[in-house]
Amino acid sequence: MKLGHRSLLDVASLGIPYAFTGITTRGRLTHDDPDLVRRYVTAQTEAIARAKRDKTFALKVMGKYLRTANPAALAESYDIDVQKYMLKVPLTTVEAMRSVLDDLAARIPKAKDSEPRKFFDDSFVRQLQSSGFIDALYR
């Protein structure tokens, strides 16, 4: 318990795949301007690597955007958000998207029967991964 807050549940410890974050765009953009999408995904992947490799820099950026200089709060946020939840290879999986759709089904019943693959395109990240680009970021 820090700063008077109690952790009720560590979602990551449950081992349930879940798409916590993602990049959203119209599907048409991935067809009309794939280079733009590729550049954005590349920059996002580089930013993740920088945050994971350079804690001092990441804490400075987080402090600016979270509008706090509290070192304990920033360190805890870094450990949870960057080290625990940010994936080195930011891939969404069918299982993770299925969990999201199952959650949505209470409000949007047709989500339960939707095909998870319809909602994400992992080809850009997979290209970065297969080219060795992501591994090179961590060397």
What do the predicted segments below correspond to?
Residues 1-12:
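Ligand-binding "clamshell"
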Residues 102-139:
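Conserved C-terminal helix/tail region of periplasmic/extracytoplasmic solute-binding proteins
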Residues 5-6, 19-23, 27-28, 100-101:
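Small-molecule pocket liners
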Residues 16-18, 80-81, 121-123:
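Short secondary-structure boundary/hinge segments and terminal tails
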Residues 13-16, 29-30:
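Solvent-exposed loop/turn segments at secondary-structure junctions
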